[in-house]
C-alpha cells in the first residue's frame, strides 16, 4: 500500500450528496479482483454519454461535457470534495480502488458511509470529515479559482487552503500509523512474520498431533 504523509494537490468538486458506490464504480465492472484498471470507469454513468461495459475502449467513448471530472481545469486532480453520505449503498471495495486508480489520494466530505470509510483506509485512500460549513468554503474556493489546491498534512492532521486557512481533522492513531507507513492488514501481519513462525514452530513441538 502506498504511504501517505503530506500532499499539495489539485482539487475537484463533486457537488452531490448521497453518492453511492454504484455511481462510483457501476456493478458491471466488479468482475475483476485486481486493484488496478478501474480509473477509466470511475463515475462511468455520469462521465460518459453511452453505456459502459468491461473491455470497451474508453478513449473513444463520448464524454459528458457537463460532468465535472471532464472539465479541463480539473484534469490531474488528487483531492476530491464531496457532500454528505459519500460512498453509501452496497459494500464494494472496488469503489476506493477506482478512486485511487484514477489518481485521487484524498476525499473530503461532511460524512461518509461507514463501510466505504473503512475500505478507504484499507486501500491507502485518506477520507477526511470536515464540518458542512467548512465544506461550503472549500467548494466556493475551488469553483472561484482555477488551479485551486489544498495541502493535506497527515502528521499534523490539517487541511490548508491557498489563503493559509487551516482546518483540523480526526483520525485514529492506528489508522494514521498505517497510512504514514504504507501498511495494509497484510503488511501489518508480515511485520510479525518472525514471531508467527516461532509460535508455529513451538506448536509443532508441543502439540504435534495438530500437524498430522
From Swiss-Prot:
NCBIfam families the record matches: leuD (TIGR00171), PRK01641.1 (NF002458)
Pfam family, one: Aconitase_C
Keyword Ligase in annotation: no
Name of the protein in question: 3-isopropylmalate dehydratase small subunit
GO function term, MF aspect, one: 3-isopropylmalate dehydratase activity
Known EC number: 4.2.1.33
GO cellular component: 3-isopropylmalate dehydratase complex
Keywords: Amino-acid biosynthesis, Branched-chain amino acid biosynthesis, Leucine biosynthesis, Lyase
InterPro entries in UniProt: 3-IsopropMal_deHydase_ssu (IPR004431), Aconitase/3IPM_dehydase_swvl (IPR015928), AconitaseA/IPMdHydase_ssu_swvl (IPR000573), IPMI_Swivel (IPR033940), LeuD (IPR050075)
Quaternary structure and interacting proteins, as annotated: Heterodimer of LeuC and LeuD.
Family: Belongs to the LeuD family. LeuD type 1 subfamily.
Function: Catalyzes the isomerization between 2-isopropylmalate and 3-isopropylmalate, via the formation of 2-isopropylmaleate.
CDD domains linked: IPMI_Swivel
Protein origin, superkingdom: Bacteria
Swiss-Prot/TrEMBL GO biological process terms: L-leucine biosynthetic process
Organism field: Laribacter hongkongensis (strain HLHK9)
Reactions that this protein is recorded to catalyse: (2R,3S)-3-isopropylmalate = (2S)-2-isopropylmalate
Protein's pathway: Amino-acid biosynthesis; L-leucine biosynthesis; L-leucine from 3-methyl-2-oxobutanoate: step 2/4
Keyword tRNA-binding carried by entry: no
SUPFAM superfamilies: LeuD/IlvD-like
Organismal lineage: Bacteria, Pseudomonadati, Pseudomonadota, Betaproteobacteria, Neisseriales
HAMAP family reported for this sequence: LeuD_type1
Amino acid at each position: 500500500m502506498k504511504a501517505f504523509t503530506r500532499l499539495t494537490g489539485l482539487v475537484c468538486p463533486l457537488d452531490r450528496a448521497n453518492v453511492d458506490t454504484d455511481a462510483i464504480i457501476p456493478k458491471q465492472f466488479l468482475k475483476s479482483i485486481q486493484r488496478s484498471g478501474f480509473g477509466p470507469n470511475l463515475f462511468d454513468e455520469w462521465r460518459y454519454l453511452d453505456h459502459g461495459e468491461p473491455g470497451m475502449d474508453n478513449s473513444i467513448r463520448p464524454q459528458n461535457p457537463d460532468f465535472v471530472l471532464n472539465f479541463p481545469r480539473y484534469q490531474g486532480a488528487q483531492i476530491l470534495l464531496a457532500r454528505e453520505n459519500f460512498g453509501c449503498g452496497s459494500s464494494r471495495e472496488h469503489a476506493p480502488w477506482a478512486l485511487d486508480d484514477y489518481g485521487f489520494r484524498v476525499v473530503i466530505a461532511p460524512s461518509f458511509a461507514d463501510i466505504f470509510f473503512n475500505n478507504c483506509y484499507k486501500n491507502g485512500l485518506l477520507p477526511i470529515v470536515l464540518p458542512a460549513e467548512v465544506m461550503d468554503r472549500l467548494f466556493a474556493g475551488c469553483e472561484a479559482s482555477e488551479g485551486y489546491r489544498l495541502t493535506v498534512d497527515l502528521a499534523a492532521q490539517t487541511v490548508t487552503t491557498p489563503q493559509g486557512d487551516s482546518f483540523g481533522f480526526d483520525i485514529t492513531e492506528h489508522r494514521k500509523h498505517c497510512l504514514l507507513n504504507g501498511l495494509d492488514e497484510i503488511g501489518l501481519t508480515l511485520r510479525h512474520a518472525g514471531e508467527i513462525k516461532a509460535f508455529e514452530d513451538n506448536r509443532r513441538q508441543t502439540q504435534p498431533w495438530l500437524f498430522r
